[in-house]
Amino acid sequence: MNTSAVAASATELDPRVENLVQGAIDLHCHSGPSVMARYLDHLEAMREASEAGLKAVLLKDHYYSATPVTYLLNKHFSNLGVLMLSGVPLNNAVGGLNVHAVEHGIKLGARLVWMPTFSSANHIDHHKQDHKFTDKFPQTKKKMI
């Protein structure tokens, strides 16, 4: 085992790793604001991506499309040289499998459509034993229909 790698500072990157991220695209960035706690906000994510040399970042939130936010980031912070993208998450917050959300998202510039994640039957069934599930994935209190 290479103990020097373990002892290296977290801020020191192996040059091979740095070369890999140059021009890369992060396809799954959970920045904020969000109803769930996030480590950094969308602008901080853009700045960190710029510093790392990434070409683009795709922002994902389980509750809303960040596409309008990416439009503003790209317009006002183009000097950072990172293209910010987003898509449409088809969880309950946007009506689930909602063709209208997809159509409007695409018109706004969405680049990806995510099938339901935390609101899918499979995800709920998998996590039903977790008593903190609704803390991790906030849910609506009442059915709409």
Regions found by a protein language model. Give the residues of each.
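An N-terminally biased module of ancient metal coordination in phosphate/nucleic-acid-related enzymes
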Residues: 2-83
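Short histidine/acidic/glycine/proline-rich micro-motifs that form metal-
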Residues: 31-33, 90-93
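Extended substrate/RNA-proximal surfaces in nucleic-acid metabolism proteins
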Residues: 80-83, 91-145
